[in-house]
Amino acid sequence: MKLLKGSGAALLALFFALVYLLPINSRLLWQPDETRYAEISREMLQRGDWVVPHLLGIRYFEKPIAGYWFNNISQWIFGDTNFAVRFGSIFSTALSAVFVYWLATLLWRNRSTSFLAALIYLSMLLVFSIGSYAVLDPMISLWLTASMVCFYLTLRAETAKQKIGAYLLLGLACGMGFMTKGFLALAVPVISVLPIVIQQKRVKELIIFGPIAIVGAVILSLPWALAIAQREPDFWHYFFWVEHIQRFAEKDAQHKAPIWYYLPILCLGVLPWLGLLPAALLKGWRERVARPELFFLLSWVLMPLIFFSVAKGKLPTYILPCMAPLSLLMAAYATDCANKMHMRALKVNGAINLIFGFICALAILVIGMGWVGHLVAYGPQEHQKVILATIAFAGWGIVGFATMRNNARHWHWAAACPLLFILLVGYLIPQQVIDSKQPQNFIQNNFNELSSSRYVATDSVGVAAGLAWELKRSDILMFSEKGELSYGLNYADSGDHYISAQDFSDWLVHARQKGDVSLVIQLSRNEKIPDSLPAADKVSLMNRLALLWYKKTP
């Protein structure tokens, strides 16, 4: 802890640079998420339209606007690079860590604990996986974290003026959250604070001052809400009923999963700090009266977790907002353990990292080398990747072992367990995964044919977004499948963006009279190119991605 106290800021900055900045540009974009958000912002900048999101020139109503604004600004500053695509998420994660540090300082007035909380947060597997990935979840997590910090300020406020200011800030944070991901940003803070206001008997205060937060949120979001309602009257109907009600509650909700789905996600997500999880949560409950700030954090963790577990639609990214309060609970528990020399949990944490690292290293070595016949992850030419992956996870285990030694004296170095893996992960991905989920590699290998084509079509929205991003054109056509663009394609002015499988042959005859045609299809595992497709002048196949190139006819 002395090391954190003496040079915590420098160590934290170094860790952030190594994990969140250094390796980011070299990693290819993943489809469908990263290619989608990259292309939406590229098109917004190209069109100069910061009100209505479009993807491939088609209306895209799945999310509000603020997250795209983050990404727009990133691309405007850093250009069309993978780093720019991910910088919005990285910046949001950094600000979330700042809020974690600030709240820890407000709670405990201890710089070492504050730095530790921020370090735990930034080093959590779920946080750095999503926080360096181009999705909107780091941004909504930022605003939910900010809203809970603002709510804590309302609890500390002593005068009516201070309470009004704190509730106004709370409303502004919720308003930004709403403009990032919708009504979720309003529901999560409300359910998080209910147990707190009940325990502290502040229900009356919430009723009196709560409307100030509502007014603040409305004032912030109303200009864009009215602007898009004027431009696209159907936006709010689609966004509310389809994106919220169906996704979370109805029988046909997207990404359905059992109620216990988040338990293993939570355990994996807090690595390399899993050994602190049970006792930190238990401490928050046992000391809820003596240390009400721990109950504040516990409610912030559990209420959203219960809410997302009950909802039918589930994704691992949904519980990212739970990581900030968890890091604070863990920091408080670890600090108490270290101060009282109760090192058992810290040793257990090291043992978990040791076991996890070496089990993963062994599994990758055995499977990667083809020693388990029916499990094929890497090709015969990818043994170097297998060795690097084995070394990366072995490094995780070695650091875990080091944190156990000398009575867990260096327990806080658990943050370094995933460091080697993070730095190398871009070079460890099997080629079959790259060719399926990272279309930039495929596009670059077939760039001449694709860039010279008058028409480019594909049967995957994620691949289409990748094509549009790499080729800097938004007129990529959808072939056979509509995917998440189904709603936007229903508009009369977007009908020509889609070609059905039945109409493709006739369409191709006319299209080839105007120029070359490229069709990119994504195959299932071991699937062959369908015989029903017209014979191409050139075929390029890379695992599950295939390019059928048709030359212009005289």
From Swiss-Prot:
Its EC number is 2.4.2.43. Its main location: membrane. GO terms for cellular component: plasma membrane. GO terms for biological process: lipid A biosynthetic process; lipopolysaccharide biosynthetic process; protein O-linked glycosylation; response to iron(III) ion. The chain crosses the membrane at residues 4-24, 87-107, 115-135, 178-198, 206-226, 262-282, 293-313, 315-335, 352-372, 384-404, 410-430. It comes from Yersinia enterocolitica serotype O:8 / biotype 1B (strain NCTC 13174 / 8081). Pathway: Lipopolysaccharide metabolism; 4-amino-4-deoxy-beta-L-arabinose-lipid A biosynthesis. Catalyzes the transfer of the L-Ara4N moiety of the glycolipid undecaprenyl phosphate-alpha-L-Ara4N to lipid A. The modified arabinose is attached to lipid A and is required for resistance to polymyxin and cationic antimicrobial peptides. It is a multi-pass membrane protein. One of its GO terms (molecular function) is mannosyltransferase activity. It is found in: Cell inner membrane. Keywords: Cell inner membrane, Cell membrane, Glycosyltransferase, Lipid A biosynthesis, Lipid biosynthesis, Lipid metabolism, Lipopolysaccharide biosynthesis, Membrane, Transferase, Transmembrane, Transmembrane helix. PANTHER family: MANNOSYLTRANSFERASE YKCB-RELATED (PTHR33908), UNDECAPRENYL PHOSPHATE-ALPHA-4-AMINO-4-DEOXY-L-ARABINOSE ARABINOSYL TRANSFERASE (PTHR33908:SF3). It is an enzyme of class 2 (transferase). The gene is arnT. It catalyses: 4-amino-4-deoxy-alpha-L-arabinopyranosyl di-trans,octa-cis-undecaprenyl phosphate + lipid IVA = lipid IIA + di-trans,octa-cis-undecaprenyl phosphate. Belongs to the glycosyltransferase 83 family. InterPro entries: ArnT_tfrase (IPR022839), Glyco_trans_39/83 (IPR003342), LipidA_mod_glycosyltrf_83 (IPR050297). This is Undecaprenyl phosphate-alpha-4-amino-4-deoxy-L-arabinose arabinosyl transferase.
